[in-house]
Amino acid sequence: MDKLQKTLEEWKQMLDPEQYNVCRLKGTERPFSGKYDKVKTDGIYHCICCDEPLFDSTTKFDSGCGWPSFYAPLENSAVIEVRDMSHGMIRTEVVCAKCDAHLGHVFPDGPPPTGLRYCINSVCLDLVPRS
């Protein structure tokens, strides 16, 4: 996969302020505030920055954490997991493999079959419904 590279200024022109803060500056939207937290529409969730397909709605579940949660990415190659030691915690950050957008974090407390919970900011996603 070819990486999509832009300067921070280019991203700032392309994204709204909240998208820029979360996707490029590694911010986090408030829990239960994102538009996809409770959505059950069948489709594919794409990266808001580069339109790369990231998650399938069939792997989405209600974790109760306030952010959309998935037990697996669409393809393992769609995301990259990075050790995150910010805020006095050790976590695993999830970024888009194509454009390095910060998406959220993955935790080992999800349902079968993976036991993982990809906790993703709604503002980083664009849901494309299946026809």
UniProtKB/Swiss-Prot annotation:
Signal peptide residues on this chain, from the entry's feature table: none
EC number: 1.8.4.12
UniProt entry tagged with the keyword Transport: no
Enzyme class, spelled out: oxidoreductase
List of residues binding Zn(2+): 47, 50, 96, 99
Domain MsrB: 8-130
Manner of cofactor binding, per the entry note: Binds 1 zinc ion per subunit. The zinc ion is important for the structural integrity of the protein.
One MF annotation (Gene Ontology) recorded for this entry: peptide-methionine (R)-S-oxide reductase activity
SUPFAM superfamilies to which the protein is assigned, alphabetical: Mss4-like
Assigned keywords, A-Z: Metal-binding, Oxidoreductase, Zinc
GO cellular component, as recorded: cytoplasm
Cofactor annotation: Zn(2+)
Catalytic activity: L-methionyl-[protein] + [thioredoxin]-disulfide + H2O = L-methionyl-(R)-S-oxide-[protein] + [thioredoxin]-dithiol
Catalytic center residues: 119
Lineage: superkingdom: Bacteria
Any GO BP: response to oxidative stress
Short name of one Pfam family: SelR
Family note: Belongs to the MsrB Met sulfoxide reductase family.
The protein's name in its UniProt record: Peptide methionine sulfoxide reductase MsrB
Organism, scientific name: Pseudomonas syringae pv. syringae (strain B728a)
